[in-house]
Design a protein with these regions (language model features):
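Bacterial N-terminal signal peptides
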Residues: 2-14
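N-terminal secretory/targeting leader peptides
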Residues: 4, 19-115, 123, 129-329
Length: 329
């Protein structure tokens, strides 16, 4: 999932060590899990240069890349404490700020990018208002690829995961619920602990995208990969509204516009590289698992999980609305 965070992070504003001097530029301190040397990191730097240039030096982004500020949980905590101002986050981080947004990752509901785009376009204003209500500005959306199951052990049906040690992010209620319906016991640790867990066999199954599996090197400890994905890793860039409001209206627009342009450039890379990573993993010997023979069982688990999350993570009415939109209604 780190890749996902990284990806999302690349799309938004950065940060600084000190907020803004009265006679100097407003500096936005931005944390990202994306390594500075990665394609994501390079787009992030380009975005920072463009923002500074278009604001004529009135504001700038200062990036803390490669997880130097911790995990997504740390990002949110530090933003609230005033230690940083912005971050690139994925599913987990977004859900820590606005819980209902996790409806976009409800198991089996949205599995294709065009579905996700349609749903978000229809509900964007509603979600942005949710972020405003808790003191954040959602600068732009960004995604981390198709989320599928990877395992060190053979699997074909949901019950096969019961004997395993599947990982669920400690702040992710969605996949934990999914595993709970199956009857599997998740190992709940942060994303930065997954590789070590795979090495020691404390973890043997992970949900992630192909691009993440490669970028995090998790694939080196895994042997099987589901052909079908069960959702899409969402993400985006957020900034504390207090900092955003210090910008002039013109510079606010520049921040939003440049963030959006960077996000769209990143989307192209994610879609291309996630597909490429999936094919590369198969070429390197990863066994592709076609879930179709037991699709009815997987669908039943996903449906029950979505229903159990309703009322606890998102409302039943929001789930119904997203379900209709995802179906093109």
């Amino acid at each position: 999932l780190v890749v996902a965070f990284a990806i999302a992070a690349l799309f938004l504003p950065g940060g600084t060590a000190s907020n803004a001097a009265a006679d100097g530029p407003i500096v936005i301190r931005y944390a990202s899990l994306a390594p500075s040397s990665s394609a994501f990191g390079k787009i992030l730097k380009a975005w920072g240069r463009t923002f500074k240039q278009e604001t004529e030096g009135r504001a700038e982004l200062r990036f803390y890349a490669g997880g130097s500020q911790g995990d997504e949980r740390d990002f949110i905590r530090k933003i609230r404490a005033g230690q940083i101002d912005a971050a690139g986050i994925t599913t987990t981080g977004m859900g820590m700020i606005v819980r209902p947004i996790l409806v976009l990752t409800a198991p089996g509901l949205i599995t294709e990018m065009d579905q996700l785009e349609h749903v978000r376009t229809e509900l964007r204003a509603r979600f942005e208002e949710m972020f405003h209500d808790v003191g954040f500005e959602l600068l732009t959306w960004g995604d981390g690829g198709k989320n599928r199951l990877f395992s060190a052990n053979p699997f074909a049906r949901p019950a096969d995961l019961k004997a395993g040690r599947p990982w669920a992010w400690k702040d992710d209620p969605v996949f934990a619920s999914y595993l709970g319906v199956i009857g599997a016991n998740p190992v709940r640790v942060g994303a930065n602990e997954v590789y070590g867990g795979l090495q020691t066999r404390m973890i043997d199954t992970v949900p992630c995208s192909g691009i993440m599996a490669v970028a995090m090197q998790w694939y080196t400890k895994l042997n099987y990969m589901a052909k079908q994905n069960f959702n899409i890793i969402i993400g985006g860039s957020i900034v504390k509204k207090e900092i955003f409001d210090r910008l002039t209206p013109g510079d606010q627009k520049i921040l939003l516009d440049t963030a959006e342009r960077s996000a769209r450039a990143m989307d192209k890379i994610v879609i291309r590289d996630d597909t490429k990573a999936y094919k590369t993993l198969i070429e390197r010997g990863m066994t592709e698992v076609n879930l179709t023979p037991y699709q009815a069982e997987w669908d039943a688990v996903a449906k029950k999980s979505r229903e159990e999350l309703a009322g606890r993570v998102y409302s039943k009415s929001l789930l119904d609305q997203v379900t209709k939109l995802a179906a093109g209604k």
